[in-house]
Amino acid sequence: MYLEQNILDQLRTLFAELRHSYTLLIERPAGAKGDELLAMITDFTSVRDRLTLEDKASDRLCLTLLRDGQKTGITFRAIPSGHEFTSLILAVLNADGQGRNLPDEAFIARIQALNTPLKLTTYASLTCTNCPEVVQSLNLLALYNEGIEHEMVDGAIYTEEVE
């Protein structure tokens, strides 16, 4: 088990009222990082029948969130642990309309009026205390405008892109 029992219990409570179905599509290479992502998301999706895992072999490490089989525009090229674990939880809750700090109707209209397509990439450290706020805000843009994609990238895994 990757996630501790108390975390799984909290996730069960948080996701108890999900109204949509969510697929966490992971693409992963063979090896330790891919196995770690699989273990984490296997545990994560085990807490609710509306959460499913789809696993694909790939040369990159990636997690994409789908709502009712459709892309949400949210991708993590990371193992979203540390501070970014909250970003993953909120991505699901916000996609379901149950998260926190959801924008009001006026702000949603402004998001929907943005000239798209836009592909936003955030390079983050899983120990950064400010990064989750940025990631969560940009995820909201993707949720409210289908022409926007946001990808959070762990700079410690994708060092060649950071340099």
Question: What kind of feature is each model-predicted range?
Answer:
Residues 7-11, 105-106, 163:
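Short amphipathic beta-strand starts and helix->beta connectors
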Residues 8, 23, 53, 92-102:
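N-terminal secretory signal sequences
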Residues 66-100:
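Non-catalytic, surface beta->alpha helical segment in thiol-disulfide oxidoreductase systems
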